[in-house]
């Protein structure tokens, strides 16, 4: 893999990971359409390290508050504040994704990366995102998230193991179904993505280093993912404060149709 290819894939990862359009689908489809060799799931996960850095920096105040809350809970054995509850809810939301990742890891690396699976997932989740977002009332904010909400959204995160579903797409759809407003569901989705992304990076980064080495392309890809992720996070949070998820749903469906049309033309 060249430095240029790694940078392109890093930008693709960074721009699409925060958006409900499936970064894994874009990372699998980009080499397919450009005629590059598939760098594999380990490289994709390594690029997530760049996104993780962007998330940590963007939400640094929230994480500092939650770290303080976790320390307070450990000392007092009491849950008293909104931040205390959020710590417990994020832990609860992370567990289903961790279990799903362990059980479905082999399928995620092989069968799930099929263009047919990706195109189908893009279209189906796009329709679900549009329908749920359109008919869910704007009712609750982030401070009103309950343990039940966290577990349901966490279970939805498991679906993201299928490229084309999108972690952001599945969790934001679940959050809107639970009648959380768009800015709140976006922020909660980002916060809950960090522990599971960190776990995936810890597990898969050694594989990426073995396959690609601690090389300039790998480092360039991670850096490109970090910068573009920070940009995408800031743009999305401003956008959903005023607009629906409709544009992302339409994009998903159109991309899925393009993939199917391309596959048909090559057979």
Curated annotation (Swiss-Prot):
Membrane disposition: Multi-pass membrane protein
Keyword annotations of the record: Antibiotic resistance, Cell inner membrane, Cell membrane, Cell shape, Cell wall biogenesis/degradation, Hydrolase, Membrane, Peptidoglycan synthesis, Transmembrane, Transmembrane helix
Superkingdom of origin: Bacteria
UniProt signal peptide: none
Transmembrane segments: 39-59, 87-107, 112-132, 145-165, 183-203, 216-236, 244-264
InterPro entries according to UniProt: UppP
Function: Catalyzes the dephosphorylation of undecaprenyl diphosphate (UPP). Confers resistance to bacitracin.
Protein name as catalogued: Undecaprenyl-diphosphatase
């Amino acid at each position: 893999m060249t430095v240029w290819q790694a940078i392109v894939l890093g930008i693709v990862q960074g721009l699409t990971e925060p958006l409900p359009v499936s970064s894994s689908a874009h990372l699998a489809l980009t080499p397919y359409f450009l005629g590059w060799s598939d760098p594999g799931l380990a490289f994709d996960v390594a690029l997530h390290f760049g996104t993780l850095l962007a998330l940590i920096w963007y939400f640094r105040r929230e994480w500092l508050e939650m770290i303080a809350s976790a320390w307070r809970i450990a000392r007092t054995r009491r849950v008293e504040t909104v931040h205390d509850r959020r710590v417990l809810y994020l832990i609860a939301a992370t567990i289903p994704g961790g279990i799903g990742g362990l059980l479905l890891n082999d399928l995620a690396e092989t069968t799930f990366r099929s263009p047919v699976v990706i195109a189908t997932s893009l279209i189906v989740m796009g329709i679900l995102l549009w329908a749920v977002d359109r008919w869910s009332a704007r009712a609750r904010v982030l401070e009103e998230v309950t343990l039940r909400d966290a577990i349901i959204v966490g279970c939805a995160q498991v679906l993201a193991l299928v490229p084309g579903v999108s972690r952001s797409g599945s969790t934001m759809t679940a959050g809107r179904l639970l009648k959380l407003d768009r800015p709140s569901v976006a922020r909660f989705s980002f916060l809950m993505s960090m522990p599971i992304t960190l776990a995936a990076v810890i597990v898969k980064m050694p594989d990426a280093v073995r396959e690609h080495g601690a090389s300039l392309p790998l480092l360039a890809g991670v850096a490109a993912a970090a910068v573009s992720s920070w940009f995408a996070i800031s743009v999305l949070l401003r956008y959903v404060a005023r607009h629906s998820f409709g544009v992302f749903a339409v994009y998903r469906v159109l991309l899925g149709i393009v993939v199917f049309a391309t596959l048909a033309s090559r057979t």
